[in-house]
Amino acid sequence: MSTPSQAEVRRMIAAAGTIVVKVGSSSLTQPSGHLDPDKLDALAAALAQVRLMGGRVVLVSSGAIAAGFGPLGFDSRPVDVATQQATAAVGQGLLMARYETAFGRFGIRVGQILITAEDTIRATQYRNVERTLDRLLDLGVVPIINENDSLASNEIRFGDNDRLSALVANLVRAEALVLLTDVDALYTAPPSQPGSRRVEYVPNVIDALGDIQVSGSGSKVGTGGMVTKLEAARVAAVSGIPTVLTCASNAGPAMMGDPVGTVFAPVKARGSSRRLWIGFAADPRGTIVVDAGAGQAIRGGRASLLAAGALEVHGDFSAGDPVWIDAESGEHLARGLAGFDSEEIPQMLGRNTAQLKRFLGPQYAHPLVHRDNLVLV
């Protein structure tokens, strides 16, 4: 697809029938870290206007931990995982109660969906989330999504919901992604640094960010930084979805296509939901290392990974789990869904189809990763 102009990207966003909006904890809280009802009400009002004009809106909202640590008597966000999870369990209900009141003023119902990273790994769970979101939107509800911080493992970090928002945009076939943060745009360097300039338009987020300095650290009440927001914009861009990044007070103008924040152009036409899931949603559980011949065939775009071209297998995974396909150098070539359990694959390595049938049985005469379940990276 040809690269659209900045004006064209902003028109795409303004014309979007389905919009996913992500807001971080720092955009919903007071300087003390407590939830700020006025900020939440202002955001709900901006989203309600889109919904009342016939648009479909999904909100990916952080803030459960930020909403909970004040009522529990903490002065600041807890740092240990167990206390964070307990705080999120208290805060999520408080957060949703505020949203229900705020949207209720406009006669709009909201529905809560809590997701863990595990829900993006198994295709069945992924499809269940997809169906639930579709039905909520059909019913005129504004789904409010958050990572299930009270159950999530691995230090409760999905990227402050940034990557999750891009995956949700794929799930609901959104035509725009809006990332709301505590700065008004992307800058060439930290905004406080002399000479820093606002970046109004990024035509190709994959190629054009080498000269932009970003920080991986987030605020004291959140977990994400600009790095995770750029990753979300990248996922959206290669999924055919335009993105705008700005501060929460600019939510309304951003969705109307006004010249605020930073817009990121889509760099590919939209792919299938299944292939987008394989490529972005599912965290690989292991790695299959391939020889040069298999690597060349995979790079060609339409080849399955056969056991004859596989050299090594690493990790513990089951058939159907996502895996990396790597060259001997360690370069990631593709992601795919494994056709066999990891414990079955070592005996298959290097064998052609005839050998697999003869020595292991006909049930093993199949690709390690079928081409329909493989996405180049």
Curated annotation (Swiss-Prot):
<dbReference type="GO" id="GO:0005829">
    <property type="term" value="C:cytosol"/>
</dbReference>
<dbReference type="InterPro" id="IPR005715">
    <property type="entry name" value="Glu_5kinase/COase_Synthase"/>
</dbReference>
<dbReference type="Pfam" id="PF00696">
    <property type="entry name" value="AA_kinase"/>
</dbReference>
<feature type="binding site">
    <location>
        <position position="62"/>
    </location>
    <ligand>
        <name>substrate</name>
    </ligand>
</feature>
<feature type="binding site">
    <location>
        <position position="161"/>
    </location>
    <ligand>
        <name>substrate</name>
    </ligand>
</feature>
<feature type="binding site">
    <location>
        <position position="22"/>
    </location>
    <ligand>
        <name>ATP</name>
    </ligand>
</feature>
<feature type="binding site">
    <location>
        <begin position="223"/>
        <end position="229"/>
    </location>
    <ligand>
        <name>ATP</name>
    </ligand>
</feature>
<dbReference type="GO" id="GO:0005524">
    <property type="term" value="F:ATP binding"/>
</dbReference>
<dbReference type="InterPro" id="IPR036974">
    <property type="entry name" value="PUA_sf"/>
</dbReference>
<comment type="function">
    <text>Catalyzes the transfer of a phosphate group to glutamate to form L-glutamate 5-phosphate.</text>
</comment>
<dbReference type="InterPro" id="IPR001048">
    <property type="entry name" value="Asp/Glu/Uridylate_kinase"/>
</dbReference>
<keyword id="KW-0028">Amino-acid biosynthesis</keyword>
<keyword id="KW-0808">Transferase</keyword>
<comment type="similarity">
    <text>Belongs to the glutamate 5-kinase family.</text>
</comment>
<keyword id="KW-0547">Nucleotide-binding</keyword>
<dbReference type="InterPro" id="IPR001057">
    <property type="entry name" value="Glu/AcGlu_kinase"/>
</dbReference>
<feature type="domain" description="PUA">
    <location>
        <begin position="285"/>
        <end position="363"/>
    </location>
</feature>
<protein>
    <recommendedName>
        <fullName>Glutamate 5-kinase</fullName>
        <ecNumber>2.7.2.11</ecNumber>
    </recommendedName>
</protein>
<keyword id="KW-0641">Proline biosynthesis</keyword>
<keyword id="KW-0067">ATP-binding</keyword>
<dbReference type="InterPro" id="IPR002478">
    <property type="entry name" value="PUA"/>
</dbReference>
<dbReference type="InterPro" id="IPR041739">
    <property type="entry name" value="G5K_ProB"/>
</dbReference>
<dbReference type="Pfam" id="PF01472">
    <property type="entry name" value="PUA"/>
</dbReference>
<dbReference type="InterPro" id="IPR036393">
    <property type="entry name" value="AceGlu_kinase-like_sf"/>
</dbReference>
<dbReference type="InterPro" id="IPR015947">
    <property type="entry name" value="PUA-like_sf"/>
</dbReference>
<dbReference type="InterPro" id="IPR019797">
    <property type="entry name" value="Glutamate_5-kinase_CS"/>
</dbReference>
<keyword id="KW-0418">Kinase</keyword>
<dbReference type="GO" id="GO:0003723">
    <property type="term" value="F:RNA binding"/>
</dbReference>
<dbReference type="GO" id="GO:0055129">
    <property type="term" value="P:L-proline biosynthetic process"/>
</dbReference>
<dbReference type="GO" id="GO:0004349">
    <property type="term" value="F:glutamate 5-kinase activity"/>
</dbReference>
<dbReference type="InterPro" id="IPR011529">
    <property type="entry name" value="Glu_5kinase"/>
</dbReference>
<keyword id="KW-0963">Cytoplasm</keyword>
<feature type="binding site">
    <location>
        <begin position="181"/>
        <end position="182"/>
    </location>
    <ligand>
        <name>ATP</name>
    </ligand>
</feature>
<feature type="binding site">
    <location>
        <position position="149"/>
    </location>
    <ligand>
        <name>substrate</name>
    </ligand>
</feature>
<comment type="pathway">
    <text>Amino-acid biosynthesis; L-proline biosynthesis; L-glutamate 5-semialdehyde from L-glutamate: step 1/2.</text>
</comment>
